[in-house]
Amino acid sequence: MNIFISGISGTGMGPLALFAHDAGHQVFGSDLHEGPITKELKAKNLTFAIGPQTGNYLAEIHQKTPIDWYVHTSAITESHPEYQRAKSLGLKISKRDELIETLVEKHHLKMVAVAGTHGKTTTTSMLIWLSQKLGLKASYMVGSTLNFAPSAKYDQGDQFLLYEADEYDRNFLAFHPWLSLITFVSYDHSDIFATAAEYQEAFLKFESQSEHLIFGPHANLHHAELLADKHPDVLLMSAKELMLPGEARRLDATLAIKAVQRILESLGREVNHEEIIEAINQFPGVGRRFERLADGLYSDYAHHPEEIRATINVALEEAKRTQKKGVVILYQPHQNIRQHEFFDEYRDIFHGIKKLYWLPTYLSREDPKLKILTPSDFLSSLDNPEIGTADKLDDTLFAKLRQDLADNYLVILMSAGDADPWLRQKFL
């Protein structure tokens, strides 16, 4: 099958491109800018173009190698030139979920899906790490770069697909997993789900499509009660003591451990609990999830109040362990529309930190009628506004951060926008 993937270098589409390539399909693609997966795509010698997505490149590829399937992100609407060109060429068109489900069926894989508002990437990465350490034959796709493996892999003969299942745009409803892990459920993505009830209903439907379920301790456990008759093997679990920083990361680890135990049992293999614990305690982490960039300097993808709270707990633990003076946070909110929803939730989540540098919101898919909230709007609403200043990505901020590091603070960026590449360019 010949596949053309739009948005190929991002963390959503890039792993799919790598997986399909490994599975023997010819993969081409395009992207407006180079993304986090670009290096991995080049290492596999995939053919793709970076720049304006006019549709001309798609047509050129199609003329040489007839494309069977055009796959696009949510950012590519029906009016987009490349989408229009795919339509005019008579190509099959879909988002990634339909292609992934087709590949799962074609290659006879049992999907182990990780879903939830937070913790998906870390939990999936832990599953990948454990599967490699324990010699499990498992393919995978994860929405991040990994520092111990590619972001996706398929090997012929693999029995399982470890997959980070995204609820955005209801993508995960295309799947019927053998096993689903539900990390945490808290209302998000109001541009897709009009109400919290609608968001919950999507998760409930996803759970009903799963053969087996494992819930994290904070994943709205009433779902398990609702599904108990249909799924008598629903597993409710609690955290165990692990040698990993941060309660949230330890909870993610317990889910990954329980999933690996279930996989091993299904294969008739012995479950060596000590071996599993030893392996998970060696987990090296994930790109953009409390990622260490330099001594005392970290970057994290957190941009939801619950994620921020969890990441602060990790940072405070790490600062204490490494004898830092305290924690300094550089925060860039993501999407103005979401900030209107989260505004009141920020009030008390920054307790325990020493300094907070608040950046303007990274704008994406916005409602033009909504007022753009400023850093000052947020800071004035905090319980502890004295810790914060309104800042921007400039040399003044760089000087502040450099001084904080020199003064032995732990500095962490929390952002899903353009602050991460800025930080790397300045410090690395």
Model-derived features: positions:
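Short loop/edge segments at beta-strand edges and connector loops
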Residues: 50-52, 95-97, 142-144, 216-217, ...
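Conserved residues at the C-terminal ends of beta-strands
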Residues: 73, 183, 216, 359, ...
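Helix N-cap/beta->alpha junction signal
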Residues: 97, 217-218, 301, 415
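Acidic, glycine-rich loop-and-beta core segments that form the ion-binding/anion-interacting portion
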Residues: 252
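Phosphate-binding loop of NTP-binding sites
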Residues: 19-25, 42, 55-65, 74, ...
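ATP-dependent carboxylate-amine ligase
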Residues: 1-48, 65-70, 88-91, 204, ...
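Short, ordered loop/turn segments at secondary-structure junctions
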Residues: 32, 53, 98-99, 218, ...
